[in-house]
Amino acid sequence: MIEALPSGIVLGLIPITLAGLFVTAYSQYRRGDQLDI
């Protein structure tokens, strides 16, 4: 049970991290389009 908690935390953080990276990349992509215009 002791090892289940860290693994659960990691499994919970991975989607959040991927979502954060996607939002950051998307926002930078949108800024690039606005600057190009």
Curated annotation (Swiss-Prot):
Origin: domain of life: Eukaryota
GO molecular function, one term: electron transporter, transferring electrons within cytochrome b6/f complex of photosystem II activity
Keywords for this protein: Chloroplast, Electron transport, Membrane, Photosynthesis, Plastid, Thylakoid, Transmembrane, Transmembrane helix, Transport
Transmembrane segments: 5-25
InterPro entries according to UniProt: Cyt_6/f_cplx_su5, Cyt_6/f_cplx_su5_sf
Keyword Signal: no
Keyword Transmembrane tagged: yes
GO biological process, one term: cytochrome complex assembly
Subcellular localization, as worded in the UniProt entry: Plastid, Chloroplast thylakoid membrane
Protein's job: Component of the cytochrome b6-f complex, which mediates electron transfer between photosystem II (PSII) and photosystem I (PSI), cyclic electron flow around PSI, and state transitions. PetG is required for either the stability or assembly of the cytochrome b6-f complex.
HAMAP family: Cytb6_f_PetG (MF_00432)
Complex and partners: The 4 large subunits of the cytochrome b6-f complex are cytochrome b6, subunit IV (17 kDa polypeptide, PetD), cytochrome f and the Rieske protein, while the 4 small subunits are PetG, PetL, PetM and PetN. The complex functions as a dimer.
Protein name, per record: Cytochrome b6-f complex subunit 5
Taxon lineage: Eukaryota, Viridiplantae, Streptophyta, Embryophyta, Tracheophyta
